[in-house]
Regions:
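Membrane-permeabilization and membrane-interfacing ectodomains
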Residues: 4-314
Length: 314
């Protein structure tokens, strides 16, 4: 049975490309760029994001370097923070010329103040926002209904992206649907553990507590392409100059449509864009001429008890 959606012109369109057979969806990324090396980092770049002017509110957690949580809430809900008094900690911003400062009162408001001071420092002048993506990957969707499967930790965002695509796409002969994730990684803030431990009076639940050792900031984008060409042909265009394939009347992307959501600031609210020109501008200037440093996209945790790195396995 063929599924249908109604576009903004109230025309009934096939939700599934006509030339595909709808079996059980198996989601698989095709990676074009992946510079990640640290397997101990948790990616949190899409867990809390929302969409501007949609019923999909961003829920950015109250996190900062030095914050302490139970293991089972770390990188998930980030709730039940342990707010017992801590020793002062040294923060390091990994600019080319590192900026080092002491956070006397280890809490969120003090942390934000330290970021403001760092951004005004002479050390920050040595920092240039990266222009090369940290990660770019694509996946064939087969159906718009599969978008939600791409965001297992944020179904609301996936559902919103699906509905936006259903509303905006207006193509009669769709041969392929695909989604892409783009990550630009900015600077990292890390901490040194005080020699006499993090807590002034160690809590009784040391075994279950972990603290945020590093936070990495960056910007992200998610986009969906509906094309009258095959997925492999679309993927191939992004290995070269995709804008040539958009401007060329016979190009792979010339008749394609795109929904682009970009997330670039601490509020974690995605902006909606609808053209390949918008995507090109984002890829060329992801940090908006240095006017944004992004939002937390990676974090790393260590155990309070033994100061060893925390992973899901331990």
């Amino acid at each position: 049975k063929e599924e249908h959606l109604v576009n903004k012109n109230n025309e009934q369109l096939p939700q599934n490309p006509k030339d595909t057979v709808q079996n059980k969806f198996i989601f698989q990324w095709d990676t074009l760029i992946d510079d990640s090396k640290n397997d101990d980092e948790f990616f949190i770049g899409n867990q809390y994001i929302g969409v501007q002017r949609w019923e999909c509110l961003a829920t950015p957690p109250h996190i900062y370097v030095g914050a302490t949580f139970p293991k089972n809430s770390f990188a998930t809900t980030f709730d039940r923070e342990n707010i017992d008094k801590k020793h002062p900690i040294d923060l390091t911003f990994n600019f080319p010329i590192p900026y080092i400062t002491c956070m006397e009162d280890v809490k969120g408001s003090e942390y934000l103040q330290k970021i403001k001071e760092a951004l005004k420092s002479k050390e920050f002048q040595s920092y240039t926002s990266p222009q090369r993506p940290y990660i770019i990957k694509f996946a064939e969707l087969k159906s718009l209904s599969n978008i939600e499967n791409c965001f297992p930790y944020n179904k609301e965002f996936g559902n919103a992206l699906k509905k936006i695509a259903q509303q905006e796409f207006n193509m009669k002969n769709i041969k392929s649907l695909c989604i892409s994730e783009v990550i630009f990684k900015g600077f990292t803030i890390s901490m040194d553990v005080p020699s006499d431990g993090l807590f002034i009076a160690p809590p009784s639940s040391l075994e279950e507590l972990v603290y945020i050792r590093t936070l990495t900031y960056g910007v992200t984008a998610y986009f969906v392409i509906a094309s009258n060409n095959s997925y492999q042909n679309v993927l191939e265009t992004f290995k070269n100059s995709f804008m040539d394939e958009y401007y060329n009347p016979n190009g792979t992307l010339h008749e394609s449509q795109i929904i682009l959501l970009t997330i670039s600031d601490i509020n974690q609210e995605a902006s909606i864009k609808l053209t390949f020109n918008d995507l090109n501008r984002f890829l060329k200037n992801p940090f908006i001429n240095g006017n944004t440093y992004g939002y937390p996209i990676y974090c790393e945790a260590f155990s309070i008890k033994n100061n060893k790195v925390f992973t899901r396995e331990n």
